[in-house]
Design a protein with these regions (language model features):
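An N-terminal structural lobe/cap that precedes and organizes the functional/catalytic core
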Residues: 1-81
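Catalytic cores of phosphodiester-bond-cleaving enzymes
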Residues: 1-7, 56-133
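Generic structural hydrophobic/aromatic packing signal, biased to beta-strands
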Residues: 14-17, 118, 183, 190-192
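Short amphipathic alpha-helical patches
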Residues: 37-41, 92-96, 141
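Short, low-complexity, polar/charged sequence segments that are solvent-exposed and flexible
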Residues: 42-45, 88-90, 202, 210-213
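Low-complexity, polar-biased intrinsically disordered regions enriched in Pro/Ser/Thr/Gly
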Residues: 47-54, 97-101, 168, 210-212
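Low-complexity, flexible helical/coil segments
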Residues: 50-51, 61, 103-108, 217-232
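C-terminal, charged low-complexity interaction regions
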Residues: 131-260
Length: 260
């Protein structure tokens, strides 16, 4: 499938509240996360097809869906967006100063809001994809989201963006499987794992588990690691005993346009 962005009709069912209404564009990740980068967006199925020039679409600011209403895009997500963008900017500032890039660093974040920012933007991926389990956490900032999912994070020092909603991993031999939402864009990556018992086969990123009991606006010190990071295509490029499942309607990659 080749998509034309922004994907979605001007009217339809909002992916967050479920109401049939006018729909607005939502960038994944938030537009303020990384602005002014010309990209070519393609479905993961096209990107891994083996073609030298997989089908893609020009997009100035990444993956953009017209799938949520103005109210949800504004009053519901804006607070979460601010926390998510603030986190990305703090990491960017560290990466810009080589003297700060040590084995270990920490930043201040609002983990409950950041987690909902990730969920909110992943909820906007795809058309007519309302899920009550998503909306309950987005409309209630005191819900038990971080006890229902395990939100992994890591520093992502690569270009391009990866957005995977319709994605799952299974480790063969009865070692578990899970639906996994993946959002990667310089300088951060997140993997929201819906089966908290699931363990990646080769590497375990840090998670938000210790913040599950935090208040919505409560701040925390978040540790960052800059060594031993996985490659650009982890975890979707599987090896060993892990297999990956995905559907192209909810799995996209965006690469910087080549100059010249």
């Amino acid at each position: 499938v080749t998509f034309k962005f922004p994907v979605g009709p001007s009217k339809g069912r909002c992916n967050i509240c479920g109401q049939d209404t006018d729909l607005t564009e939502n960038h994944v990740p938030p537009k303020a996360w990384a602005q002014g980068i010309a990209l070519r967006v393609s479905s993961v199925a096209d990107a891994i097809s083996g073609e030298k020039k997989p089908r893609s679409h020009k997009m100035p600011n990444g993956v953009c869906f017209r799938s949520i209403c103005r109210t949800c895009n504004g009053s519901v997500l804006s607070r979460y967006d601010k926390a998510l963008v603030s986190m990305s900017r703090e990491v960017t500032e560290i990466l810009r100063d080589r003297s700060k890039v040590t084995y270990y660093q920490s930043i201040r974040i609002q983990p409950q809001l950041v987690a909902r920012g990730v969920l909110g933007h992943m909820s906007s991926v795809g058309l007519n994809r309302y899920e009550e389990r998503h909306s309950q956490h987005l409309f209630d900032d005191r819900s038990d989201l971080l006890r229902q999912v395990r939100l992994h994070y890591w520093v992502y020092p690569y270009s391009g963006r990866t957005v995977l909603r319709d994605f799952g991993l299974c480790v063969l031999g009865g070692k578990g499987s899970s639906a996994v939402y993946v959002l990667k864009a310089y300088p951060l990556a997140f993997a929201m794992v819906w089966n908290r018992e699931f363990q990646f086969e080769d590497w375990q990123p840090r998670s938000f588990d210790s913040f599950a009991g935090f208040e919505p606006d409560q701040e925390a010190s978040l540790p960052l690691e800059f060594v031993g990071l996985p490659g650009q295509v982890w975890p979707e490029h599987v090896q060993g005993s892990t297999i990956a499942l995905l559907h192209s309607d909810g799995a996209f990659v965006a690469k910087e346009k080549r100059r010249g």
